[in-house]
Amino acid sequence: MARAALIVCLLMACAWSSHAVMFKLSPNTQKCLKEDIQANQLVMGEYEVSDVPGQIIDYIARDTKGHILSQKEHITKGKFSFMSEVYDAYEICFISKVPAHQRGIVQEVSLLTKKGVETKSYEGIGEASKLKPLEVDLKRLEDLSDSIVRDFVLMRKREEEMRDTNEKTNSRVLFFSIFSMCCLLGLATWQVLYLRRYFKAKKLIE
């Protein structure tokens, strides 16, 4: 019973960390998948595309600054991996290329990605450390739990940063509004005094 509950928890944690998608890629188009990844995390992926004679699909993985982390041309089926240097939004793009003389056909692309602790080989760790299967499962669950906690801490930190930014922006907007109102009141007062002196000079008012 306890082992069954442990397996359920492991499956839920794996669903949290692993991402499998399948999509259709139209001829001469590209589709990108983007995700925020913490610093110093290993990202691994497997891809497979439906084969259409004469059509080519390339893939490229890069960060928001355009640095290429992984790239391959004319792909059909394979794997890739890269290490995230800093916390950033990383994207993986699949690019379809079809010759001008050929009528393009929509291709299917499947992608499975893993990051962080999901990239570890716990079977190898268990054999090296001579751990029992249940101990390996517990080790996997512990690492996954730590990873989820770190993700929540990072989300909380980013939320606080965004809240601080919003508060600073609101304070600046309020200060600018008060400053604008003071300028308008000052300008209106100056206009009244100027017109009063003008009308007095023209002897239109006492």
Curated annotation (Swiss-Prot):
Lumenal face residues: 21-172
Positions in the Cytoplasmic compartment: 194-206
Biological process, per Gene Ontology: dorsal/ventral pattern formation; endoplasmic reticulum to Golgi vesicle-mediated transport
Domain GOLD: 30-140
Keyword Nuclease: no
Disulfide bridge partners, by residue number: none
UniProt keyword Hydrolase, yes or no: no
Main subcellular location: membrane
InterPro entries: Emp24-like (IPR015720), GOLD_dom (IPR009038)
Pfam families from the UniProt entry: EMP24_GP25L
A cellular component term, taken from the record's GO annotations: membrane
Annotated signal sequence range: 1-20
Listed name of the protein: Transmembrane emp24 domain-containing protein bai
Lineage: Eukaryota, Metazoa, Ecdysozoa, Arthropoda, Hexapoda
